Amino acid sequence: MGYLKRIGMCISLLIVIIFVTSCGGGNKITGDSKETQIKKSFAKTLDMYPIKNLEDLYDKEGYRDGEFKKGDKGMWTIYTDFAKSNKPGELDDEGMVLNLDRNTRTAKGYYFVKKFYEKDKLPDRKNYKVEMKNNKSILLDKVEDPNLKKRIENFKFFGQYANFKDLENYNNGDVSINWNVPSYDVEYKMSNKDENVKQLRSRYNIPTDKAPMLKMHIDGDLKGSSVGYKRLEIDFSKEDRDISVIDYLSYKPAKK
């Protein structure tokens, strides 16, 4: 009886060990850390920067999944906006979004001017249709304001001059994860000596010497997905004044 009892105890102990090991293993991050995985996911597009000639995207293929129909070459969407609080309770936002269809080798989109209000007032928004030919933005709508017209025609996306070849050198970021979406975020403190920061300061009116934060956000699978999206933000905000640049480059099906 004592022998059988010892065998039973050993079996019970073995079951407990297996249970603890299997449960504990599920909470461990195997391989790369989430911070490294987020950076590697972003690197798939950021390694393409700077894209000086956007028409080069017609010959580049992104991540494909089951959402793509047979024969669909896909569509690149590039976006940049600059948001700034010029008055308390208001946020002015300008930028451009351009869809580059690899099937038709055409690029169409719009330049937008938005104003948001904190109080009970709907935002103002105006879109101006544009297309791209020979790597130049062509305004299709009539614009009375000569300064606005010039900004539209001379507009450059962040991805056309940004350079993230040293992305792997960004370390010790503040990582947050929402497993329900899932979504992933990591933030890094940038230096004013960073070439990307210098580029933004030379192109936009940024009335602060504060070094910005680099914020990287992913919705969806870290390995890639045509359903989710990635957004990069360089945030110069201080106190009650919002100042930021948002950028993204995505690859999705062109045919619904």
Curated annotation (Swiss-Prot):
Transmembrane segments: none
Keyword Transmembrane helix set for record: no
Keyword check for Endoplasmic reticulum: no
Bilayer topology: Lipid-anchor
Keywords: Cell membrane, Lipoprotein, Membrane, Palmitate, Signal
Subcellular location: Cell membrane
Annotated signal sequence range: 1-22
Lipidation (S-diacylglycerol cysteine): 23
Any one annotated GO CC term: plasma membrane
Matching InterPro entries: Csa (IPR007595), Csa_sf (IPR038641)
Lipidation residue positions, type N-palmitoyl cysteine: 23
Similarity comment: Belongs to the staphylococcal tandem lipoprotein family.
Protein's name in the database: Uncharacterized lipoprotein SAS0400
Organism: Staphylococcus aureus (strain MSSA476)
Organism ancestry: Bacteria, Bacillati, Bacillota, Bacilli, Bacillales
